[in-house]
Amino acid sequence: MTLPFAEWLPKQRWYAGRSRVLASVKEASATPLGEELDLVLVDVEYTDGSSERYQVMVGWGDGPLPEYSTIASIGTADDGRDGYDALYDPRATRHLLGLVDTSATAGDVTFEKEPGVELPLEAWPRVFDAEQSNTSVIFDEDAILKLFRRVTCGVNPDIELNRVLGRAGNPHVARLLGSLQSADDSGPCSLGMVTEYAANSAEGWAMATASARDLFADAEMRADEVGGDFQGESYRLGEAVASVHRTLAEELGTGPAPFPLDAVLARVRTAAAAVPELQQFVPAITARFEALTGAEVVVQRVHGDLHLGQVLRTPEAWLLIDFEGEPGQPLDERRMPDSPLRDVAGVLRSYEYAAYQLLVDQDDDEHLAARAREWVDRNRAAFCDGYTNVAGADPREQGALLSAYELDKAVYEAAYEARHRPGWLRIPLRSITRLVG
């Protein structure tokens, strides 16, 4: 069985090789999961020497739902059968959920249901269209199956930390319901996970930007007077993040570590080489980091890539999602303990983005810039107050360290924006100016 993956893969939104030239595509394995359903692992090599492994659930039956026929149809195999992406076939995804429910084994693939959970086997599945790097299938209002498109062997931190937090009863994550993995000579390889679905939820980024937009729309009102004031939600978000940190510390432990001076200085050098606008700040940034030579930090497992787009507000609570860590980093590095200040800094940076991204075309408007700063300061303070209420320690009391983690994040952002959104580069540069000033 050979399908034309070389033509189909580059058209998928989760394909990560668009900036590289494809050299070869070959099927590494095909595991039958049913009469007309195979789990296929596809190895991709690029001309620059890099490689990736992708996961595709291939269906051979009547085909996907008609509205998805274009994106899901892979093509005709060498045996004459037509293959398609089975995640767009409700019968196939219901079958996958059933395999999780029975903790089934198929070849080298194992499915595992979490203890004491019930899966919505009769629910109607639909693909979540907004997903980028993975593909998720929602089962009514009850569960969501996330299939990892790029397969990397090792313990997946998203599954690992959701399992720890769920079994500990932390209320600020969507409970893990099950998972699936394969095994090869390198060890276990996580393939997907099933969690509770956060029905009737709103993304933190959307809520925050709406609040800032409301403030800018009424030139006479203060941040605490507009209808979309976000301060209370920021306080509760701080409490939620601190709660997750506390549970992870209790369940997985903490320890001392030196401030990662070499790593942050290396990121500065790399970013400055790619972003000319950053070079004038390098001496001041370097001095800020080198002032922490010999500093010791308390490290533990953390989210690792926390920002307002990684949190959901349900009617009951804030939820933290996507514990996969910083994208692009090796799996073992994403599982390394880090300072909780890394997550705090990520949220604080995100407040600046929520406000200032609305002003990228009006950067010379001093009045709007002042109102943006008012909104940012108000919500940063509320978040830290909420965090302190649960953690028992104020992250602002570690001012030099917290600023260093913010600065490290802003340097990363500058490199990202210069490459992908040059019009937004002024946002991290504004923050760097403030942090080193």
Curated annotation (Swiss-Prot):
GO MF entries: ATP binding; kinase activity
Pathway named in the protein's UniProt entry: Glycan biosynthesis; glycogen biosynthesis
Protein name listed in UniProt: Maltokinase
Superkingdom of origin organism: Bacteria
Assembly and binders: Monomer.
Gene3D superfamilies noted in UniProt: 3.90.1200.10
Species this chain originates from: Actinoplanes missouriensis
Family listed: Belongs to the aminoglycoside phosphotransferase family.
Protein's gene: mak1
Task of the protein: Catalyzes the ATP-dependent phosphorylation of maltose to maltose 1-phosphate. Only maltose acts effectively as phosphoryl-group acceptor, but maltotriose, maltotetraose, maltopentaose, and maltohexaose show a weak potential to replace maltose. ATP is not replaceable as phosphoryl-group donor.
